Amino acid sequence: MLKRPWHIVAVTDVVASSGWYTTLLEAQQNHPGARVFNQISDSDGTVLLCLHWWGPSGPHGDHDWPSLSQKQKRHAACGVLLWFVVDDFDAAWERAQKMGATIHEVPNTNNGTGMRSFVVQDPDGYFVAVNEIREVAAPNNL
C-alpha cells in the first residue's frame, strides 16, 4: 500500500505563497487561485506541500485546528524546516536568487547529507532547505 505524507503549513496569503513555491521548485498548483487551501505538486502529480490559510476552513468553517488557525500563539517557523530534494540543484539556486528569496544559507555541504543544499525563507518566515538529489549507485551485477 502506498503512503505519502501531505505536509500542510499555514500561510498568510495562499495565492502569493503558491506562486513562491511553484517558482522555487518549478512545480504546479492543484488549485490555482484558491485563497484558503492549495497543493503544490510535482510534474507527476505527487503532492510536495499543502498551503493552508491562517484560519478556520472547511465547507462550514468548522475545521479550526489550532496549529493552522492561531497564528498569534506561535511563530510560523517554530519547529518546522521544509526540506525539498531537487533533480536540478543549480537551476533551483538560480531561481531562488532571481525571485529575490531571503537567503539564509548559500550552497554548501555542511548539512549532514554530504550533498549540496541551500536554505531560504518563504514569505511567511518558514525556512526552506533545497538539497540536490543523491545519485544511487547501480548494484554490481557480476
Q: Where are the predicted features?
A:
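N-terminal amphipathic/basic helix or basic patch
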Residues: L2, V9-A16
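Ligand-binding pocket scaffold of soluble enzyme catalytic domains
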Residues: A129
